[in-house]
Amino acid sequence: MEKSKKIILAILIATICCVIFSFQTQKVGFHEDEGYTAASSVNPSNGLMVATDENGNPKWLTKEYVTDFVTLSPKNIFNFKALYLNQAYDNHPPFFYTMVHFASLFFGGHFTKYNVFIVNIVAFILSLIVIIKILKLLNKEKLIPATLIFYGLSMGTISMVIFQRMYMLLTFFVVLYFYQTLKIYKNNFKLDGKTITLLGITTILGFLTQYFFAIYAFAIFVLMIIQMFRRKANKELIKNYFLAHVIYAILGILIFVPCIKHLLFSDRGISNLGNGEYFLHFWEYIKHFAYAFSINTNYTPLIIIALVIFFGLIIYWFIKSKEKFIVVLTTLPSIFYFIIAVKMTSFQELRYIMPTLPFASLAFILSLDSLFTLKNKENIITIIATIIVFIGLFTSKPLFLYKDYQKCLEIAKQNSEKSFVYVYDNFFNHMQSIPEMMIYKKTLIVNTNGNNELEFMLKNDELNNESSYILSIKNYIDNDEILNKIKENTDFKNIEKIYEGPTSKYEVGNNLYLVSK
């Protein structure tokens, strides 16, 4: 019987993974952060493809150069120094990028949409396995199918497996840390060498994956210390638990010393605690949370009703539960994390609250379990979970697919012998269009907020000697102003719009023009 249960769970996990993989195959374009992930995991010099020369002027990049930039060359395999320095230059720790580095070896070091997917899908599967262990530890084994379905097939989870950043791996380490803490609690706070070692590995790798891990770990750690005092645990146990975490923190910092600068002085650290418009940002995150679990974000009353029901169920679970600390440990750190994430992030995006999704799933399923008293309540809960996720699967779609970008790639293939001029207003978003730049003969990247870069483009002899070229301009920029400057200051008098980019932030918003004389 035990063997058949394992087979059924394996089939369920495989089915969930197949659904996610089917969406991954539909992914066409990339977020600029995804482009940076690919480059910084394999490039020895810098993850950001610099678009200017030593004088600050735009420089031509051949398609071979761009391709090499996101390709892991044989001489850079296992170049851990470069991985370390790339992330020291950026504002993230290096473990996730190291995993992507290894994953790229499966594809000969080439740039593909599956390099990061391998890392994310493995982290996802491992998180499911840990959730299974959590429910077994709580003697709620019959709730495993419902929880795996509700969490694994939610739009939020699918989106984060597809999104080629570190948030799925972060979520795995948060869930693993929770599970190990739960085991310590269930074992009357006893700590042996194996427990301390495993908890240490999880804590350090979680921190070296994404600094936000520390927020979750801190909340769980504080609750455990409080509970130890409430239960009048042995003072030696409390001291060992506390000192172990101090050592974990010191080791994490020593392994990646640049984290001090990142956390204290970067735009991703504690300086973000000064961000304003808190309640507006809070509501944006609530909408992301609602989207994650199949709730239509266009209907505010529906979101509010769903939240009232959700927290009502949690309160009921707390009242009915004989182990109230487990209810607190499952829910309160997520609430704390959510509140801090709202304050700490410059952009309100689903990725930053991804670690809350497995705990919201656990809380929802366990709350329903406390509510129902029917004999076959587990089957009913599984049906409810399945209905909710199917609503999402049929009425919504995962984020970060960028399917409209296919048209840009088709235009690039049709004009591969032409030069490509990419116009935007910053120093980073060009990483989103790397797939196009790998097709066109050569690319000139122009920042309208740069050092007279637009004027440099207009006077560039190499460009002006062309009979025609493809021009890409971000659709939020004043396109007409740039087009008029081209007509007025160059021999290129014929400009035809061949593609109008979508305005959604989850698509590649570039307008394409055929510019000719």
Q: Where are the model-predicted features located?
A:
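Signature aromatic-anchored transmembrane alpha helix within multi-pass, membrane-resident enzymes
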Residues: 9-14, 201, 362, 368-395, ...
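Transmembrane-helix motifs of polytopic, lipid-linked glycan transferases
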Residues: 115-138, 176, 312-317
